Amino acid sequence: MAPIRTKDKHKNAEASSSKSNKSHKKKPNHQPKASALPGKQKIKSSLRQVRRLLAKENLAADKRVEAERRLKALEAELQQVEQAHKERALAIRYHKVKFFERQKVTRKLNQVKRRLDSADGSEKEQLEAQLLEERVNLNYILHYPKTKKYISLFPPEVRKGEVTEASKTDAEKTNREREEIRQWIRDSMEKKELPSEPETQLGSGPGRPQASTQFPSKKSSNPVTKSGVQSSKPGDDIEDDEFFGNDSEDDGNEVEDEEDEDEED
């Protein structure tokens, strides 16, 4: 009678069992992050706990004082987090339109500077005034208030010359708001809170000086949403817009696109 090889069968059984176990191993469960706003939910949870504590009638006086201080600190922290996330969202949303406008303004500014080299008399005065306006425009783009929806320097109706009756009211309001911010930029430049020659600091990244004062907010003013400037998807067609590439004297030195340029300041 031939011998029975039980050892090989045992090995085969073990191999089969190990393969089965491997195939049935649970794959790691990659849960998506609960929130794209890190820290916000934790702060809100802490706020609820503190408010529940303060709601107790028999809470000791010293504990109440401590809880009230904690409440104020948490509320301030939550406000900072929400503001930071609002700034980030707006920076991402308007990155493209601000980039192309910065290119346009920088080219115009360089053209004026070249013309100034050979100008004199009244022409020189006009060019100096124009140079100041272009520098205001450049600071406008670089240092626009971070918590406000961006109002374009060159809205679609200006770029394409299409002004309808329906858009006139919106355009008037938008123009007023734009000019208010430009005036704030001028004042900040006069106070040395913003650079008088912003073109010399392009590409300096996080080291770029920022306005030391914030643009005064108006609680009653609502961002314009009807005009083309404040569309839900700003800048979608801006890459193909000839307006941003039709300068008569292109100096060939276009501004390079930096990673997280304006919004990461």
Swiss-Prot record:
Compositional bias segments (type: Basic and acidic residues): 185-195
Leader sequence segment: none
GO CC terms, sorted: nucleolus; preribosome, small subunit precursor
Ranges of biased composition (kind: Acidic residues): 237-265
An individual GO BP term: maturation of SSU-rRNA from tricistronic rRNA transcript (SSU-rRNA, 5.8S rRNA, LSU-rRNA)
Compartmental location: Nucleus, Nucleolus
InterPro entries: Efg1 (IPR019310), EFG1_rRNA-proc (IPR050786)
Pfam families, per the entry: Efg1 (PF10153)
Compositional bias annotation for Polar residues: 210-233
Residues covered by region (Disordered): 1-46, 161-180, 185-265
Annotated keywords: Coiled coil, Nucleus, rRNA processing
Coiled-coil region list: 55-121
Record's compositionally biased regions (Basic residues): 21-30
Known function: Involved in rRNA processing.
Family classification: Belongs to the EFG1 family.
Protein name per the record: rRNA-processing protein EFG1
Native source organism of the sequence: Coprinopsis cinerea (strain Okayama-7 / 130 / ATCC MYA-4618 / FGSC 9003) (Inky cap fungus)
